[in-house]
Amino acid sequence: MAGIQLNDDVTTVYNDFKLSHKYKYIIFKMNDDMSEVVVEKTAEKTATYEDFVNDLPEKSARYGVFDLHYETEEGAREKIIFFLWTPNGCKIKEKMLFSATKATIKQALVGLSAEIQATDAGELNLDDIIAKVKTISK
């Protein structure tokens, strides 16, 4: 399982996302021969969290980063959230590859505030995500 590489576009597109606020979210996948993580989709700043969830496939694993904006008693907050999406319908080998490569991609994506691992849409409830981020970010 070792040896999965990150396509150069992964860090380039992520840096545009983080530094230039060019996108609302990015979804990453493995290439066809499962040897490299590649950018699958970037979403315009007008995209919503619902769009992000809808772009995650039902039977294939993905990584994602989402620019989360939310309110606290202290005011508005913005955090970059990393998602590991391994739905119940995806193959065991794919789940293992994505889990094994998670540390590699997280290391390349500097500035992540929180990590969410989900296997079904119920685990992607926005209110629950915000609550988790608030507890992590104190």
Residue ranges of model-derived segments:
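Long, low-complexity regulatory segments enriched in Ser/Thr/Pro/Gly and acidic residues
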Residues: 1-138
